[in-house]
């Protein structure tokens, strides 16, 4: 299978303003409606903040966010954390986020899609990955899960969000674009085929401690709160 995540999101960014002339920030078009979570951007941001940020992140934390889009969740994270590392495979997404947030308390890092090189060991207290793994193939998710623990310190809290193809809304999403992703090729912005059982197997195999599994807040998807292992 060939997936060019980087080019897919660069192309998305190029066409974004034309496709969403009413919006100021890229990423604000993702309001959670198709996922069954919300009906407006404000409602979706409130859900993310109250359910997945406020309970786990405080003013002493450095947060590593993998997959930042246009900085929507990064802006929410900055309300709670001390420092934020914004890591993304797309230069355009990094630029859009920097324009939105500036550089105070924020570091920006271009990812290669395989490693987390450029992030020093034991740099962050929390890893936050929301609206990103929904696009990643299972093997790519597993790969990141093997790389994250070395970058964390302290309680090593992780918030991971992925799609569940077997949920009712996940299946609707699958039926929407399956025929555009054939012959071993898939657009990097499409949703992957992923399930909660696969993610649980990944986490358990790698010795992550599962704290909470949430399949209610975002009915199409699944969000895991877990603690990364010391060593993989």
Report the location of each language-model feature.
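Class I (Rossmann-like) S-adenosyl-L-methionine-dependent methyltransferase catalytic domain
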Residues: 1-60, 66-120, 136-143, 147, ...
């Amino acid at each position: 299978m060939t997936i060019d995540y980087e080019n897919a999101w660069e192309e998305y960014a190029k066409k974004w303003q034309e496709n969403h002339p009413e919006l100021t920030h890229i990423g604000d078009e993702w309001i959670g409606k198709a996922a069954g979570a919300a009906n407006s951007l404000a409602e979706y941001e409130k859900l993310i903040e109250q359910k997945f940020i406020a309970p786990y992140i405080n003013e002493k934390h450095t947060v590593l966010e993998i997959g930042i889009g246009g900085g929507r969740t990064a802006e929410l994270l900055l309300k709670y954390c001390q420092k934020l590392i914004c890591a993304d495979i797309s230069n355009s997404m990094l630029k859009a986020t920097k324009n939105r947030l500036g550089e105070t308390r924020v570091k920006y890092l271009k990812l290669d899609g395989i490693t987390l090189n450029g992030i020093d060991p034991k740099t962050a207290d929390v890893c936050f990955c929301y609206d990103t793994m929904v696009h990643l193939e299972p093997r790519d998710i597993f790969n990141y899960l093997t790389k994250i623990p070395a970058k964390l310190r302290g309680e090593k809290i992780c918030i991971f969000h992925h799609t569940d193809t077997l949920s009712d809304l996940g299946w609707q999403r699958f039926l929407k674009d399956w025929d555009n992703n054939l012959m071993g090729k898939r657009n990097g912005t499409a949703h992957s085929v992923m399930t909660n059982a696969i993610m649980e197997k990944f986490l358990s195999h790698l010795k992550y401690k599962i704290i909470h599994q949430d399949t209610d807040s975002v009915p199409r998807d699944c969000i895991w709160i877990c603690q990364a292992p010391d060593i993989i």
